[in-house]
């Protein structure tokens, strides 16, 4: 199974991948410039669940 990065995250619509707005971290994406998709959250949850054992 191949998962592309585009399947896991999308560009933040507020800062347009910049991660900041007028020098302050973007509140919508926490300064990352991207927002996880539903599939991204599912993968993150799976990894965290199995690494925290």
Swiss-Prot record:
Cellular component terms per the entry's GO annotation: cytoplasm
CXXCXGXG motif repeat feature ranges: 12-19, 26-33
Record localization: Cytoplasm
Record has tRNA-binding as a keyword: no
An example Gene Ontology molecular-function term: identical protein binding
Entries under InterPro entries matching the protein: Anti-TRAP, HSP_DnaJ_Cys-rich_dom_sf
SUPFAM superfamilies registered for this protein in UniProt: DnaJ/Hsp40 cysteine-rich domain
Induction (free text): By uncharged Trp tRNA, via the T-box transcription antitermination mechanism.
One Pfam family recorded for the sequence: Anti-TRAP
Principal location: cytoplasm
Source species, domain of life: Bacteria
Keyword tags: Cytoplasm, Repeat, Transcription, Transcription regulation
Functional description taken from the UniProt entry: By forming a complex with tryptophan-activated TRAP, and masking its RNA binding site, it inhibits TRAP's RNA binding ability, thereby abolishing TRAP regulation of gene expression, leading to antitermination and increased trp operon expression. AT acts by competing with messenger RNA for the RNA binding domain of TRAP.
Complexes and interactors: Homopentamer or homohexamer.
Protein name per Swiss-Prot or TrEMBL: Tryptophan RNA-binding attenuator protein inhibitory protein
The organism of origin for this protein: Bacillus subtilis (strain 168)
């Amino acid at each position: 199974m191949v998962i592309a990065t585009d399947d896991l995250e999308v560009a933040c619509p507020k800062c347009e991948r910049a991660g900041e707005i007028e020098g302050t971290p973007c509140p919508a994406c926490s300064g990352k410039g991207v927002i996880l998709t539903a599939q991204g959250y599912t993968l993150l949850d799976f990894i965290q669940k199995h690494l925290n054992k």
